[in-house]
């Protein structure tokens, strides 16, 4: 997957994506190794769609609580595509995650999403605001008010 040849990298990401889709929960032991590599490959524009699809397939294998550090690293990635796609993945994950799990991980994710909402890249900003909106939809206005008050109007 760390090959410099685009075709080789793209094929390996598609293979991993299909493995995740097929194995579902059985792929969980390998997720912590996979996520940072996929996020790193997001820096290449030609691989962006395949990497995002690979991350989306992870929703069936792992909880966002288990990959908290990896997702936070993706939200801090130096490439805007990494930040954007990670925030979009997080938005989808928020909608399908049990509320008790979200309650445990929300402070970590929300602090970083508020920072990303002030990003210079408009796509990253929009993705972070989408994830914040998903959190607001799950938790309500009263819980989110302390985080949303930090945003610039």
Residue positions per predicted region:
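N-terminal alpha-helical segment
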Residues: 12, 31-34, 51, 67-68, ...
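Short inter-helical turns and helix N-cap capping residues of alpha-solenoid HEAT/ARM repeat scaffolds
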Residues: 4-6, 43-46, 78-80, 120-121
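Short acidic, glycine/proline-enriched loop segments that cap or flank alpha-helices
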Residues: 78-81, 96-104, 119-123
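Amphipathic alpha-helical interaction segments
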Residues: 4-8, 19-30, 45
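Short, structured loop/turn "capping" segments at alpha-beta junctions
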Residues: 47, 61-69, 81-83
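HEAT/HEAT-like alpha-solenoid repeats
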Residues: 1, 26-42, 64-77, 102-116, ...
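Hydrophobic residues within the alpha-helices of tandem HEAT/HEAT-like
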Residues: 1, 12-23, 38-41, 53-62, ...
């Amino acid at each position: 997957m760390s090959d410099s040849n685009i075709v080789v990298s793209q094929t390996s990401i598609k293979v991993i994506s299909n493995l995740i889709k097929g194995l579902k929960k059985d792929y969980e032991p390998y997720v912590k190794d996979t996520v940072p590599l996929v996020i790193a490959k997001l820096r290449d524009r030609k691989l962006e769609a395949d990497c995002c699809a690979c991350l989306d397939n992870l929703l069936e294998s792992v909880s966002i609580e288990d990959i908290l550090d990896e997702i936070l690293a993706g939200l801090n990635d130096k490439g805007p595509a990494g930040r954007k796609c990670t925030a979009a993945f997080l938005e989808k994950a928020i909608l399908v995650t049990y509320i008790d799990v979200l309650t445990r991980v929300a402070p970590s994710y929300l602090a970083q999403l508020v920072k990303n909402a002030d990003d210079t890249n408009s796509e990253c900003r929009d993705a972070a605001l989408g994830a914040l909106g998903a959190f607001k939809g799950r938790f309500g206005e009263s819980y989110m008010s302390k985080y949303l008050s930090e945003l610039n109007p």
